[in-house]
């Protein structure tokens, strides 16, 4: 297993991290939303076996959060790492959307420490920051809270996860002495949200960068379109789509570790085998060209020609325009698009949804693709809700 230093910290992290959002369920996964449903119990025996196998094979970074598996994920992880605490790095996140007053920061954090059966976490993140939530929680004293838990030892390091445009990302990076950040990054989303620009910016400021969705929630590895598979098959080297995707992420020296939300032992075994062969900058120019062709082929399937540049942002009404258009495109590009429906209907804040568009037209004035965004947002809401 390859290990890399996480930013300015003293932590050496495995290049493969274990994301605990998609653990196996007792009765199987019927819908994408099951991973947030407290009535869908985790299959503890299988999940703990997977985590123990990962630890035994060198994985040391484990990521969870308050809402994962309807609040069960942190407890399961705490149980799984009992007796292994000195071998692992635990990261969890503050449910900032549930914070209504300053005392809530401590209340939720203490509850999370109890679930994790630990007196401290290695990394505590503000979960899912965007422009609106960032300014709101700052006013509630989030940064003073982070200072406090670092000083009293309940959190060794602090960071944030992020879902918004790159200028907001840079603002947040420069606003506090963060140890690390967590961003979405894969070969299809190279310029989406924080993207490559944000990745390099954070690393240049000394932050460790952890990548989520390196396989885009499994969409880059399952249900591969025939025209994409043909490109993979044309390569001089035989690799699974998962290996291509992970190697692409690891080809960026700014990345410390890539999280994979694994739900079966087979996935754990496969990803660990890939990670054991990992090295920094592992792709040749010819291999990068193969990935570029795959990306181009996927993009030709786009229904809305949005590049994710975010020139349309910020929306004065709070709509996350690039995210809405991306979710809409996902429903056409990938065979399994249920995650797009789940995110729109269950994860986006009301103001972020396409339905919150006031049709002011300000976004269209700034769109370099000259998209009819107001009309597109109507189609987005109709397709993702059936209304």
Model-found features: residue ranges?
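Glycine/proline-rich, positively charged
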Residues: 27, 32-34, 97-212, 223-229, ...
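N-terminal binding-site loop/beta-alpha segment at the start of enzyme catalytic domains
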Residues: 1-88
């Amino acid at each position: 297993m390859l290990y890399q230093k996480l930013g300015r910290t003293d932590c050496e992290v495995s290049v493969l991290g274990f994301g605990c959002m998609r653990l196996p369920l007792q009765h199987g996964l019927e819908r994408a939303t099951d991973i947030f449903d407290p009535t869908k119990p985790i299959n503890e025996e299988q999940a703990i076996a997977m985590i123990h196998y990962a630890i035994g094979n060198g994985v040391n970074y484990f990521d969870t959060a308050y809402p994962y598996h309807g609040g069960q994920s942190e407890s399961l992880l705490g149980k799984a790492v009992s007796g292994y605490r000195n071998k692992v790095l635990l990261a969890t996140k503050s449910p900032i959307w549930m914070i209504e007053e300053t005392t809530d920061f401590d209340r939720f954090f203490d509850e999370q420490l109890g679930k994790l059966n630990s007196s401290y976490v290695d990394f505590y993140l503000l979960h899912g920051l965007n422009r609106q939530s960032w300014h709101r929680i700052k006013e509630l004293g989030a940064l003073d809270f982070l200072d406090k838990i670092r000083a009293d030892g309940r959190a060794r390091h602090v960071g944030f996860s992020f879902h918004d445009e790159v200028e907001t990302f840079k603002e947040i990076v420069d606003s506090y002495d963060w140890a690390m950040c967590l961003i979405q990054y894969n070969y299809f989303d190279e310029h989406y949200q924080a993207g490559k620009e944000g990745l390099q910016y954070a690393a240049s400021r000394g932050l460790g960068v952890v990548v989520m969705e390196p396989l885009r929630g499994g969409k880059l590895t399952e249900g591969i379109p025939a025209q994409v598979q043909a490109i993979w098959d044309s390569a001089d080297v035989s690799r699974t789509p998962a290996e291509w995707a992970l190697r692409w992420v690891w080809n960026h020296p700014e990345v410390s570790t890539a999280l994979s939300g694994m739900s079966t032992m087979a996935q754990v075994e496969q990803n660990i085998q890939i990670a054991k062969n990992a090295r920094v900058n592992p792709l040749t120019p010819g291999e990068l060209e193969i990935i570029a062709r795959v990306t181009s082929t996927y993009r030709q399937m786009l229904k809305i020609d949005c590049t994710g540049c975010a020139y349309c942002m910020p929306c004065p009404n709070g709509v996350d325009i690039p995210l809405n258009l991306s979710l809409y495109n996902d429903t056409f590009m990938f065979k399994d698009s249920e995650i797009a429906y789940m995110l729109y209907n269950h994860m986006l804040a009301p103001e972020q949804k396409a339905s919150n568009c006031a049709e002011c037209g300000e976004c269209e004035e700034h769109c370099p693709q000259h998209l009819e965004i107001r009309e597109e947002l109507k189609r987005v809401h109709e397709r993702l809700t059936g209304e």
